[in-house]
Regions:
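A structural signal for multi-pass alpha-helical bundles of membrane permease subunits
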Residues: 9, 15-286
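Short, Lys/Arg-rich, polar N-terminal cytosolic tail immediately upstream
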Residues: 1-12
Length: 286
């Protein structure tokens, strides 16, 4: 009996070591690009271009960060990205939440067809909309107008918002709505006063995913926004140039990458528990 227990314990230890090693490897692979960019952003130009590579420099510098804010209106780019991403996220939640609730709880006619259509739409990349949107923007004279990117961002995020929130709404107990109806609540009052307060994890999850997409989107912003003071961070980072046309400014690009990534990292870290709840809740039922 003791031998069997020893073998079982050794087996558990081996399994634990394997799982820990695998997780450590995955974490390392995931963090390696970020760590490399972070180190590069603090390197001197000589260390960045030195061969063999200097992995950990003896001297660090903040010149690349100060250069961003002295030679470029980088704070303006951050504010632009925050405004566009926040507005498009709010719009996608405003329109997506009632649609998801209707599909999950009210069972309208043709709901299965609607859901299937939403799933099919998610299979197509947003870039396919570019030529059509370009004609619409020209016709409505929306060039260099934030509406030309806010509306497409909201529309592209709508399917994700509807699908995630629908799965969350479907697992809510029907007794909540029955009790609300007895108290005299109509559908809109039920949604605003009862359903939404208990669906915070799902709302935060879909909101953050929508925000990240809008923050990082490049093609639409590059096409529809050309005025310097209206550009978003991805465009600003892509257009960082060196002192000559042959120079690649690795340091400033790395610094800009870290600055543009930091807000997203902080948001995800702050709301990580809500994100996990929101993503797993729809997988339990529905």
């Amino acid at each position: 009996m003791p031998q069997v227990q020893v073998k079982m314990r050794l087996k558990k230890i081996k399994k634990s070591i394997m799982i820990t090693t695998l997780i450590g490897l995955l974490v390392t692979l995931s963090l390696a690009p970020i760590i490399w960019e972070l180190i590069t952003s603090f390197k001197l130009n000589e260390d960045i271009l030195k061969i063999p590579l200097v992995y950990f420099p003896n001297q660090i510098t903040l010149d690349h960060y100060t250069q961003l804010f002295t030679t470029h209106p980088f704070w303006r780019y951050i504010i632009n990205s925050a405004f566009v991403a926040s507005t498009s996220t709010i719009l996608s939640l405003i329109f997506g939440t009632p649609a998801a609730y209707a599909l999950a709880r009210l069972n309208p006619w043709g709901s299965k067809i609607i859901i299937s259509s939403i799933l099919i739409i998610t299979l197509f990349p947003g870039i396919l909309l570019l030529s059509g949107l370009l004609e619409i923007v020209r016709f409505l004279h929306l060039g260099n107008n934030y509406l030309s990117i806010i509306i497409p961002y909201s529309a592209i995020n709508l399917p994700l918002t509807i699908l995630v929130l629908r799965n969350f709404f479907k697992q809510l107990p029907k007794e909540l709505e029955d009790a609300a109806k007895i108290d005299g609540y109509n559908t809109i009052q039920m949604l605003l006063r009862i359903i939404l307060p208990i669906t915070t994890p799902a709302l935060i999850t879909t909101g953050i995913l929508s925000f990240i997409f809008a923050w990082n989107e490049f093609i639409f912003a590059l096409t529809f926004i050309t005025r310097e003071e209206m550009k978003t961070i991805p465009i600003a980072v892509a257009q960082i140039g060196g002192t000559t046309e042959f120079e690649i400014p690795y340091g400033p690009i790395a610094a800009a990458t870290m600055i543009s990534t930091l807000p997203l990292m902080l948001i995800v870290l702050f709301f990580q528990n809500k994100i996990i709840q929101g993503l797993t809740s729809g997988a339990i039922k529905g």
